[in-house]
From Swiss-Prot:
The keyword Acetylation applies. It comes from the Eukaryota. Belongs to the IL-1 family. The modification Phosphoserine is found at S87. This is Interleukin-1 alpha. One of its GO terms (cellular component) is cytosol. Its main location: nucleus. It comes from Felis catus (Cat).
Length: 270
């Protein structure tokens, strides 16, 4: 007589096989999750070639990239399209990389050559000598004399005006019609009065010849201003300073009082 199959035994075996299969699937899923979701810190030198299992705190982190050098994008022809420098601790995400790749080409800035006019001052062209061999007296009745040694000027009360310095005045062109730039040269020499900083004595500068054009050496130029019988010589290089005198002092540059900045011009030639 044929044996009747035990249906309960078959159901039991089927249930057991499904349980084992389900267990294997769950284990595989867990392994895949830890593989894809976990992020790892860089291995230390002493941990190289050693297995390190990720901790639970390392799961579900956003992938990040740290760069220590410049990121440079170069076209096929070798031209630099984009250069960006990142700090040591700056993180670069995938979105940042995509943004850099999609940025338009930037022009590499090059230093532009500066026009000569940027460096040079206004150009002053020589015209002519407008006064010759005149004497400068201040309102203290002092005349300008040449100090011993010949490098400086001073003011002194003179009995004999032959001891006073005689000057020639050379006129130059200016952009402003209301101003007349001039040079003061000691007559029959190549020594020109040169302005210095405030309260510093003026110098006598020797030039090979009368400058035909003055650009940079504006210390040699003064704006000649006349107010009645008073004459003022304002420095072109230092527009707030005038040629000035004081008792027992060298001729110097000053803004005004206590220094004397106005002069009388005494003509010695008719």
């Amino acid at each position: 007589m044929a044996k009747v199959p035990d249906l309960f035994e078959d159901l039991k075996n089927c249930y057991s096989e499904n349980e084992e299969y389900s267990s294997e699937i769950d284990h595989l899923t867990l392994n895949q999750k830890s593989f894809y979701d976990a992020s790892y810190d860089p291995l230390h030198e002493d941990c190289t070639d050693k297995f390190m299992s990720p901790s639970t705190s390392e799961t579900s982190k956003t992938p990040q990239l740290t760069l220590k050098k410049s990121v440079v994008m170069v076209a096929a022809n070798g031209k630099i399209l984009k250069k960006r420098r990142l700090s040591l601790n700056q993180f670069l995400t995938a979105d940042d990389l995509e943004a850099i790749a999609n940025e338009v080409e930037e022009e590499i800035m090059k230093p532009r050559s500066v026009a000569p006019n940027f460096y040079s001052s206004e150009k002053y062209n020589y015209q002519k000598i407008i006064k010759s061999q005149f004497i400068l007296n201040d309102n203290l009745s002092q005349s300008v004399i040449r100090k011993a040694g010949g490098k400086y000027l001073a003011a002194a009360a003179l009995q004999n005006l032959d001891d006073a310095v005689k000057f020639d005045m050379g006129a130059y062109t200016s952009k402003e019609d209301s101003k007349l730039p001039v040079t003061l040269r000691i007559s029959k020499t190549r020594l020109f009065v040169s302005a210095q900083n405030e309260d510093e004595p003026v110098l006598l500068k020797e030039m090979p010849e009368t400058p035909k054009t003055i650009r940079d050496e504006t210390n040699l130029l003064f704006f000649w201003e006349r107010h009645g019988s008073k004459n003022y010589f304002k420095s072109v290089a230092h527009p707030k300073l005038f040629i000035a005198t004081q008792e027992e002092q060298l001729v110097h540059m000053a803004r005004g009082l206590p220094s004397v900045t106005d002069f009388q011009i005494l003509e010695t030639q008719s």
